[in-house]
């Protein structure tokens, strides 16, 4: 959020006035997005080795069997929260539309995909603490918001960080991520229930 706030002060491309709804959406959730970091700092969550870019394209698959062989792109590995890896996987894998989809109404979070991934994750990670399990949905929301804020910041700053192939692509990316967050908020109780059911 620091980068967003600094970019808003400068407004180098004079784009802020055009994206007030997106800015307001991001700022309204700023305090909540510190939940996981605050829990880490307070010692309520364990520090774990995390990948920090947990997308399907970072899993090497066998060409014949399509079974996973190993995780790749290890330059992002560092200490962190398991919730970040879980959350980024949900952001990427449970989304119903492409990251830069222009029609944000195509973007939702699939509860079916959320359930399947959650089931696999908690079974593969039997050492997750009760607090980690409780905050799994927050991991998904946090990582999705973080990406949305980063895309919005880059759009406001002139599209220097994320590669763009058309005008407004980073803004579209921000909007899809914010739509995904809004859909998670609508489905929040269901997400929490799924985690409880799959963690039994």
Summary of predicted features, one role per range:
Residues 83-127, 142-161:
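Active-site activation/catalytic loop segments of kinase-like enzymes and analogous catalytic loops
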Residues 26, 117, 135-136:
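A structural signal for short hydrophobic/aromatic patches embedded in well-ordered alpha helices
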Residues 1-51, 56-70, 163-171, 179-182, ...:
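ATP-dependent phospho-/nucleotidyl transfer catalytic cores
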Residues 128-140:
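All-alpha amphipathic helical-bundle segments outside canonical DNA-binding/catalytic cores
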């Amino acid at each position: 959020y620091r980068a967003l706030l600094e970019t808003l002060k400068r407004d180098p491309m004079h784009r802020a006035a055009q994206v007030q709804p997106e800015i307001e959406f991001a700022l309204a959730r700023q305090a909540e997005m510190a939940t996981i970091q605050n829990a880490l700092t307070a010692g309520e969550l364990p520090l774990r080795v995390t990948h920090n870019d947990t997308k399907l394209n970072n899993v090497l698959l066998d060409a014949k069997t399509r079974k996973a062989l190993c995780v790749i792109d290890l330059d992002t590995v560092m200490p962190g929260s398991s919730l970040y890896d879980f959350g980024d996987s949900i952001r990427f894998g449970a989304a119903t539309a492409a990251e830069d989809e222009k029609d944000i109404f195509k973007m939702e979070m699939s509860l079916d995909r959320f359930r399947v991934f959650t089931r696999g994750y908690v079974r593969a990670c039997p050492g997750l603490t009760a607090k980690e399990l409780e905050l799994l949905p927050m991991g998904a929301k946090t990582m999705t918001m973080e990406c949305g804020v980063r895309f919005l910041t880059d759009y406001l700053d002139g599209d220097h960080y994320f590669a763009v192939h058309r005008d407004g692509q980073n803004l579209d990316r921000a909007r899809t991520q914010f739509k995904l967050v809004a859909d998670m908020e609508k489905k929040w109780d269901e997400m929490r229930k799924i985690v409880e059911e799959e963690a039994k």
